[in-house]
Each structure stands twice: as C-alpha cells, then as structure tokens.
Amino acid sequence: MRRLFFLLTAIAYLSSCSLQHTIQRKANQFILKDVALSQAHVGIALHDPSNNKYVYQHQSNKLFVPASNVKIITTYAALKYLPDFLPAAQWTELDSAILITPMGDPSFLHPDFKKHPLFDQLKSATKPLYIRNDNWNTAALGSGWSTDDYNDDYQAERSAFPVYGNLIQWFQERSVKENPTNPNDTIDIFIYSNPEINWPVGFGKTSNRFFVKREEHENAFVLSEGKEKSATQSVPFITKGISSGLELLKDSLGKVIQLADEELLSQAKDKISFNISSQHRDTLLQKMMHRSDNFYADQSLLMVSQQILKRMDEPAVIQHILKNDLNQLPIQPRWVDGSGLSRYNQFSPDAMINILNQLRSTYNWQLIKTIFPKAGQGTLRAINDEREEFIYAKTGSMSGVYCLSGYVLTKQGKWMNFSIMVNNHNSSSSTIRKKIESFLQSL
C-alpha cells in the first residue's frame, strides 16, 4: 500500500512538472522570448481553482501598473457592498422642505438608462428641495490622472451628485437645403447639446472633423464644424463640487435645488429618511467592464465608500477594503482609484489571481460571466476563437502598458484563473494583445 502511495505521488509530481514545463515552453514561445516584448517587464500567473494551486508563475509576485485591471477590484467591492439596486439618494422630508443626501450614483440622467426614479421623485415634490454635500471628501480628478486629458470623455470628473455622466454630449447634423436661395449656401448645419447649457460657446475654424474643445479651467466651449453628415462628441464639464450639476438639473427639472445650510441639516438629524434606488447594480457593472467605463468605476467605488463610511472618501475606503477584505493578498498593492486611470496603481499578477479566485468562489459563475466580457465582446471584441466559451477577462492598457486578467478555458475543458501584465513595452497594444491571445489559446 505504501509503495502504491509513493508511486501515485511520484506520478502526480511528474505530471505537474510536465505541465509546468509545457506552459513554460509556450510562455517563452508566445510572450517571454518574443522580440516585441524583449524590453518589457512581464508577469504571468496561471492558477487552478479546483485545487487552489498555481500551474505557472513568472514574476507574478512583482508589482505592475495594471491600468483598467483595477476595475476587477472595483467590481469585487461593488458586488460585496452595494445593494442589488444602486442607491440614488437618501430622501428626508422635513416640515417645510425636502433634504436630499447624494450617494454618488453615476446613472442619474445618464443616456445609458431610460428610467430615473430619483428624477421622477424630484419632479413630483411639492416642498422646496435642498441638497447636502458634507459627505464628499474626494478630489474631482484622481491622483496620478493626466491633466492633459481633461477634454476626453474617458476622464469625466467625479462628484457626489453626478448628472448626465458629468458630460455634455454635442451633436452636429448636416443636411442639404431643400430650396437654397444662394448656390454657395446649400448646406444646413445644426449643432446642439444634451443637456442644453447656458455656458459660453464659441466657434472655431471649420475642419474635416467635428470637434469640441472646452477651456481647461472654465465651462466654456469652442465648436469646430466638421464635414460629417452626423457626428457626436462628449466632453466633460467642470463639476465645481455639485454646483454645475445643479445648474444643469435646474433646466431639466424646472426647479431649483438649493444647498442645505447648517440649520436645515440640524433639523434633519432626528428625522426618518428613506432610500431611493436607481438601476440594477449588475447592469451598471456589466457596462463598466464591457466598455471599460472609467466614470462608472470611480463612482462605484465612491458609492461603496458611502455605504461603508457614510461619506465619499476614496483614500479612506481603499484603505478599509485593503485592511478588511483584501488583507490576505500576497503582496500589498498600491491602489489609488477605482478605474485604473492612475499610473500610481500597482498590483501583482498574484494579487489579481487572489481577487479573481474570491469572485469565482463567492458569486454565481453565471453572474461573473455576465459582468466580464468574453471573446468577441466589449474590449475583447478583437479576440477571435471558434469556441463558444474561451475567455472572460478584463483588459488594461495605456502607453507602455497592456494587461489581461480573468478566466480562461483550457483545451482540457478546465477553467483557470489567469493574470498577464506587461509594462514598459514599446510595441502597439494590438501586437501585445495578439501575443497574449496566442499564448492563452495554446493552453
């Protein structure tokens, strides 16, 4: 019996060594020895959740800039702490007024969603409306974000009470005039915004492409007509806390929401409040992960902060989660935002594996597959594979950075957790993606 035990143990050990050798050879072939990654910093971790053992590791305990792979951690926090339906606001009715406590909900009046229960509630209110902002303790722009990207829609400012995704959506429509009176004036051009604004707007030179530029420190916009028949561009506005949002909401709502003073806040202390919910949490997380929506990610983390700490405090909630939920990570990460926009973020592939494993073991597998994009969807739309199921994962990319972490189905029909992080490369993201894709398809 003892001989049989040692024989089986030896076979299992040799089989494990053989598998690791095979994966090492494939990692060398497709990633580590490839000329496109010769100067890059690369980390690889492949983990079998069925026995909680690593199948392969290469520099997986090193720290990397994860870019949007941070959204995996934000997803974990949101699933753990946010209710099934997002908290839009807390509603407190006083004798002569209504006090609104914002919860950081990014879906309010966002064009992604058609129904907005909070807006309906505000519209039907018969008492004067007031809002508090003493639960906000976070900068509008994250630490380590690029200030040069202030005009880009992927870097909208964060706020306690977002409206319209904290973006102004601009539209250009060109059409041929039916009965032009001037042969040199045959085109009608209509440019408008959603929401409508009362901020300064000017016009720049006409160009081939419709373009809108906001002043860096002012909500003033310069529009350049394009030659497209129809075009659109979304531009972040300066939130000024919640002031800009309230200004935009005034026209949409037809009512003024005033900032609550200390006297009103004092009156509300002993009053019973109720929560107004908005969209389904998992719907927002799916959109966030499929298109890598930075605004949804950062606001989701702030909503988690409101649930845990009763205030929107990004540094504090990150420390709380690291201390109480992610204290078993093998290497302490540096985590600074919910989206991964910051280059200050640093995570190891081993840390990603740990979080992926927690997600898989805690939540329904079908839910995970709904939230994460698969090959051919969202940010994985360029990955092609004949199998109906091959990969569910999150990309992360910025200049010199490409990461991919998630779940991969091997040719033996086994789901594995994986994390591949590439930093300091000088190739294109598409080149790095194809190398990683080839490696994963070879497993």
List PLM regions with ranges.
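Small-residue-rich helix-loop
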Residues: 55-57, 276, 301-443
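Short Pro/Gly-enriched beta-strand edge/turn motifs at strand-loop
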Residues: 26-29, 193-198, 385-392
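Active-site-proximal alpha-helical segments within enzyme catalytic domains
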Residues: 68-78, 219-226, 242-252, 284, ...
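Bacterial Sec-dependent N-terminal signal peptides
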Residues: 1-29
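Conserved serine DD-peptidase/penicillin-binding transpeptidase domain
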Residues: 80-331
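Beta-lactamase-like hydrolase cores
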Residues: 18-63, 82-85, 120-127
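Short beta-strand scaffold segments in enzyme catalytic cores
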Residues: 44-46, 89-92, 405
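N-terminal post-signal-peptidase region of extra-cytosolic proteins
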Residues: 59-60, 112-115, 337-338
